[in-house]
Design a protein with these regions (language model features):
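Extracellular and organelle-lumenal recognition/adhesion modules and their flexible linkers in secreted
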Residues: 3-184
């Protein structure tokens, strides 16, 4: 077996490298375009829960880097690190073993306009800055991809917000979810 050691590959008629490499991360660019498809979410697989695995407390109480906020409801929401099993088709097949589980408490008076329960993740500015996404430009994009399962079939809402510089908000919808079915 032969080994060729290089840090770049360039066509004999080329004026710039077609592929660049480094010793720690392999291929770093193709035709000058950086490979930026890495996950920006720290603990996005919910494997670390230093504070505990279940709580009704708000803020950072279970899964690291993820915060629960709620208010107005009859009974507090519960947050938990939930162990997935092979019956959790979808995320299990992709190697995920945990989820961040939110249980809405018994709302005997029904949902009111001011009731809310949401998850917050605060991405680090350095990760957003190195992602290649220019959140101030309408022609720059980032992909938000996640698995979701709900016990109630309906459309759910969320948003991405940045507080770097001028605050920017980007709302999104899950689309109509089927009850108790994992969707990506």
């Amino acid at each position: 077996m032969s080994t060729v050691k290089v840090n770049a590959i360039r066509s004999t008629s080329g004026t710039s490298d077609a592929i660049t490499l480094n010793s720690s991360s392999g291929v770093t660019a193709i035709n000058g375009a950086s490979l930026k498809a890495h996950n920006l979410i720290i603990n996005g697989a919910f494997t670390v829960a230093q504070r505990g695995t279940s709580a009704t407390a708000e803020e950072y109480a279970t899964v690291d880097r993820f915060e629960l906020s709620h208010g107005g409801e009859d009974e507090d929401c519960t947050q938990a690190q939930h162990a997935l099993t092979s019956s959790d088709t979808g995320p299990w097949a992709k190697g995920f073993r945990y989820s961040y589980h939110i249980t809405n408490g018994n709302q005997t008076s029904g949902g009111d306009a001011g009731d809310f329960c949401f998850i917050r993740y605060r991405a680090e500015a350095q990760d957003i800055a190195s992602s290649g996404w220019d959140y101030t430009s309408a022609s720059s994009y980032v992909t938000l991809s996640f698995w979701v399962k709900a016990s109630v079939a309906q459309n759910y809402y969320g948003y991405i917000r940045t507080d770097d510089g001028t605050s920017q908000g980007y709302p999104f919808q899950t689309g109509s979810l089927s009850a108790n079915t994992w969707t990506k």
